[in-house]
Amino acid sequence: MLPKAARIPHAMTLHGDTRIDNYYWLRDDTRSQPEVLDYLQQENSYGHRVMASQQALQDRILKEIIDRIPQREVSAPYIKNGYRYRHIYEPGCEYAIYQRQSAFSEEWDEWETLLDANKRAAHSEFYSMGGMAITPDNTIMALAEDFLSRRQYGIRFRNLETGNWYPELLDNVEPSFVWANDSWIFYYVRKHPVTLLPYQVWRHAIGTPASQDKLIYEEKDDTYYVSLHKTTSKHYVVIHLASATTSEVRLLDAEMADAEPFVFLPRRKDHEYSLDHYQHRFYLRSNRHGKNFGLYRTRMRDEQQWEELIPPRENIMLEGFTLFTDWLVVEERQRGLTSLRQINRKTREVIGIAFDDPAYVTWIAYNPEPETARLRYGYSSMTTPDTLFELDMDTGERRVLKQTEVPGFYAANYRSEHLWIVARDGVEVPVSLVYHRKHFRKGHNPLLVYGYGSYGASIDADFSFSRLSLLDRGFVYAIVHVRGGGELGQQWYEDGKFLKKKNTFNDYLDACDALLKLGYGSPSLCYAMGGSAGGMLMGVAINQRPELFHGVIAQVPFVDVVTTMLDESIPLTTGEFEEWGNPQDPQYYEYMKSYSPYDNVTAQAYPHLLVTTGLHDSQVQYWEPAKWVAKLRELKTDDHLLLLCTDMDSGHGGKSGRFKSYEGVAMEYAFLVALAQGTLPATPAD
């Protein structure tokens, strides 16, 4: 018997418009009301019964994925402040063990264990280590942990000389924290208790109660997020304040125990900048003269004194930079692909780093020692596992430090492509795709199309060892780099937000049509997948073109756009006004309502649909997908599968652990494979 949620009408009126929400009652901020939990359990039980027929397939896929993970894995060590650091995974362990040794030791000598995350996680269903930081004198470790999956971290401190933990706990914090140079003062960011926005900077002295901590800065504008880091010079603690369109930096002297923050450059609307400091100069990435950012250098805060090192360019986005004593390395993006350039700080000679794959991603890795000439950078493509390189910038010599081992994987068996399709308004949209060479048959393969397209985030064409379980079964996997993402620069992002949000949806649907027309998939075997804001994309796609898809997976989907954006008590809502708009404005209200998936469910046939959520999700509250599924059950006219799977122990990121985290992936893949093979839907067992 299908789950059925009670219909309890709830009227919401704004701008003279009344919306009736029959499933508003599914919202329970306490996550404890029996009727709500009972409905979620009904949906879970139904989903388990439906998928029981595919348990063997799901188990097989999970085993395939886990078999591609080396049982014992050791990271490439790095040296910082006189110590060599690494983390290792031991056979059968879900979490990493973090270790260090003197930089003067040989790597085969004994390592000191800083943290065994397996022991920390032993009594919890969920565990996330958000970050650790060790004092400049190497004696105390700060550790941020989340045991609930709400991204509300607690920070604890351990004396590395005695092994003892200090008594204090800093709770409800962001995993963004910095030690002052005296190794005793600690700066951290606290979250708002209701909205969970990171909004306050506090100063803590080791060994004292958290109640004695001093508030250093509080952000009053609830569209801004607060984060911390230390400059390369170690002279400053940076308080970075950022909304979606504007930023400001305040600095603390890292040498002073009682430092007070000062503004580097006051915020002004639509000016975004970030900075670093090294060798008595500030280096700034700023969009003051162009949307795609330029790089500037100065000794003082006066903006008139900024020296332009790299001008903003129309078709190249400056994404980041890293400072070395003799070199400056920049990370850029052009026509959807990332690239790296090294610039000699004395001669201004520029050297590019070349790559061969048609679709790939590269990034500047962790480089904690600026005095070196050795650059670490990462590389991945849809057919190349993550690879860490070390480049001697003085000589040009390059070596592989580590490539992720994937047992049984042979790159020659797979082919990746980078295409451009033309959307309905004439704009070219990039698509990255990959498939197994031997299994590709033009016009006959199942095609899975992934989309996101929000916040200016770029969905790069990187490697996935779990995805191989689909490719090896004949799936073609495609990523549509729709407007609203950052793949083609700032304008690409702006053309898919606010009152242009529908470009995101149109790009995705037009790309699906084009891929089918080009023969990358069978029209009867087209599947869609997206999560969070990409889940909203899924909701819009099936409202507008349900016949296009055989099956859809919506992961933790943001689908009740108007109601959520009208409720400023919901975590993150106010910070989203500069992404979607504020529906208190009638123009934005009408526009958002016209595409919001929940508000546009109609009596029509929908494709097979698997929806996932986590009870403790802090980014997209569980009741959004729950309400959406309930409304779909009420109105849809087909007999296709509709499954809602709620993880009662996790949040936005799903299960934790390097093996357990793939249980949900295996279920999703089994759902897709079974649909493609015609073994779903099956009559669920009672």
From Swiss-Prot:
Lineage top rank: taxon: Bacteria
PROSITE patterns reported in the protein's UniProt record: PRO_ENDOPEP_SER (PS00708)
Active site per the UniProt annotation: 532, 617, 652
Gene3D superfamilies documented for this protein: alpha/beta hydrolase, Prolyl oligopeptidase, N-terminal domain
Catalytic activity reported: Hydrolysis of -Arg-|-Xaa- and -Lys-|-Xaa- bonds in oligopeptides, even when P1' residue is proline
Pfam families per UniProt: Peptidase_S9 (PF00326), Peptidase_S9_N (PF02897)
InterPro entries: AB_hydrolase_fold, Pept_S9_AS, Pept_S9A_N, Peptidase_S9_cat, Peptidase_S9A, Serine_Peptidase_S9A
Cellular compartments per GO CC: cytoplasm
Gene Ontology biological process terms in this record: proteolysis
Keywords: Hydrolase, Protease, Serine protease
E.C. numbers: 3.4.21.83
Record-level Gene Ontology MF annotations: oligopeptidase activity; serine-type endopeptidase activity
UniProt-listed NCBIfam families: PRK10115.1 (NF007511)
Function: Cleaves peptide bonds on the C-terminal side of lysyl and argininyl residues.
Family stated for the protein in its record: Belongs to the peptidase S9A family.
Record PANTHER family: PROLYL ENDOPEPTIDASE-LIKE (PTHR11757:SF19), PROTEASE FAMILY S9A OLIGOPEPTIDASE (PTHR11757)
Protein name (database record): Protease 2
Species this chain originates from: Escherichia coli (strain K12)
Gene transcribed to yield this protein: ptrB
